[in-house]
Amino acid sequence: MTLFILTETSAGYALLKAKDKKLLKRDDLATEASTAEGVSNLVKLKSFQKFDSAATALEEVASLVEGKVTPRLASLLDEIKDEKKVSLAVADPKLGNAIGKLPGMSIQLVADSTTTDIFRAIREHLPTLIPGLLPQDMSTMSLGLSHSLARHKLKFSPDKIDTMIVQAIGLLDDLDKELNTYAMRVKEWYGWHFPELAKILNDNIAYAKLVLKMGMRSNWETADLAEILPEELEGTVKAAADRSMGTEISQEDLENIQALAEQVVGFAEYRQQLAGYLTARMNAIAPNLTALVGELVGARLIAHAGSLTNLSKSPASTIQILGAEKALFRALKTKHDTPKYGLIYHASLIGQATGKNKGKMARVLAAKASLGLRVDALAEWDDDATEEDKAALGTEARYNLERKLAAMEGKPLKPRGVAIGPNGASVQPKKFEINETRRYNADADALTGDQPASKKDKKLIEEVSDEEMADADSDEEPKANGTKDDDSSDESEEESSKKHKSKKGKDTELEKMAEKAGLSVKRYKRKLERGEITFDANGNPSATSKKELKKAKKEAKKASKGDEKKRKRSDDGEEADNGEKKKKKKKKGEE
């Protein structure tokens, strides 16, 4: 069986033919192939397919790495396609499987450890096997192709560098810790000299700037603090400095305190700059995620997942509890309820929800964030696309979530036509102007209280004339003729109006009670029929869940069982006492 060897080089594809059919089974293959002459005696060049350019070489090698057969390689293999009893040695088993799947290719493929020695020898002495190929050119082409292949694998893009976000959010958290530590140290240190200042100023940055500006508290008269503090606080600080109870410090102590205060101010300025940089990078890399959860929460999610691509591959359920892994595994181990949210808890939408709705909002927000992440990671935008176009999905989803949250909380909904800004917040409306209302015209009133009402003198005794009682038939005749008495019609109208008013009153009462219970009118009626509404001492309703009702029923059953046991015990005790009394009576009778 004829043996062919396929070699992939940076210059092109080389197809070599072995002079010995049993070349791979020889024991002295490594020793004979150690020199260029030995390799040339073992194999000879059958065909060579050269790459036209560096770009072509990159495409071909990238396809080979993925285990794909390119048209150029397939055309080279067509030369040995018609030969019978042929075996082909390939260095990569994945490539060998792909070649074996080619239509009409009946070749025995060899891609195991027996080919390592011959491939090593061919790579070392390749210029001697291919005429016109110099060793210097070979090394240059290999170096250039390796650089291009590495760049191709990295898929370098300055707009998709999520490593910068990971480092920036980590540095931001470290700065917050250090800034807090240094600021507290400044307060404790300078507090020996001016202890009243810490109670007046709560802002750490303003405190450090004031220490740098004023120095000794005795300089309060000449120090201009208008740039740091408002007028009211400035007067309070100066008055406190005038009658301070602090100790005196030396100039050397003040210099060290001011050096630390300079560090605090410098860290604060750099933190503000870093926060702006992080916001810009998040809007460029993940605009939809930023519109939904904010730049800080989005950056922490990306940092926790490792990269934007890894986070986009995660399902919504994973994004929802990302950051709460310890609580999740603890709950699974102890068979308790799993956590509802992780890092996503700090998003503004979840912060706006009440306790009972936080879990629902976390689930819905994680689902929308997973969709936005896939768009951010995998979408390819044109150069003409604006930031609003890129963040359109996240902005629209945030607006829908805000409406859903308002519906759950019972708050008024925003109108559908409201304008939404790039940050997801609604644009403020124009200034509301109050028009002058129409005044009440008092001249149009008619005064009727000047004339007293006429009173008719009623007789103490009146004569009533006797009237004959009409028959039942005569009473029914006018009714049958389609006429009714005026009195009966008035009474029926009054009754219908009373019923209508009572229905309205009941509906308004139901609406009020439903609002107090935090439910809709339908749910309030349903729960009231089921007995799931309880009233406190003031008459305010509150809804109870099915779990609470079950617990209450179980407790009532336990209490009833306990009472029955106590009754049985008391009955047994009474029977025992009665038996003892009877025995005593019998003994007395016998005596």
Curated annotation (Swiss-Prot):
Region spans: Disordered: 413-591
Cellular location(s): Nucleus, Nucleolus
Acidic residues compositional bias, start-end: 463-476
Keyword Ribonucleoprotein: yes
Family annotation (InterPro entries): Nop56/Nop58, NOP58/56_N, Nop_C, Nop_dom, Nop_dom_sf, NOSIC
Comp. bias (Basic and acidic residues): 430-442, 453-462, 477-486, 505-515, 557-571
Biased composition (Basic residues): 581-591
GO biological process: box C/D sno(s)RNA 3'-end processing; endonucleolytic cleavage in 5'-ETS of tricistronic rRNA transcript (SSU-rRNA, 5.8S rRNA, LSU-rRNA); endonucleolytic cleavage in ITS1 to separate SSU-rRNA from 5.8S rRNA and LSU-rRNA from tricistronic rRNA transcript (SSU-rRNA, 5.8S rRNA, LSU-rRNA); endonucleolytic cleavage to generate mature 5'-end of SSU-rRNA from (SSU-rRNA, 5.8S rRNA, LSU-rRNA); protein localization to nucleolus; snoRNA guided rRNA 2'-O-methylation
GO MF annotation: an example: snoRNA binding
Pfam families linked: Nop, NOP5NT
GO cellular component, one term: box C/D methylation guide snoRNP complex
Span of domain Nop: 285-410
SUPFAM superfamilies: Nop domain
Keywords: Nucleus, Ribonucleoprotein, Ribosome biogenesis, rRNA processing
Domain of life, per lineage: Eukaryota
PROSITE patterns in UniProt: NOP
Record's function text: Required for pre-18S rRNA processing. May bind microtubules.
Family: Belongs to the NOP5/NOP56 family.
Annotated protein name in UniProt: Nucleolar protein 58
Lineage start: Eukaryota, Fungi, Dikarya, Ascomycota, Pezizomycotina
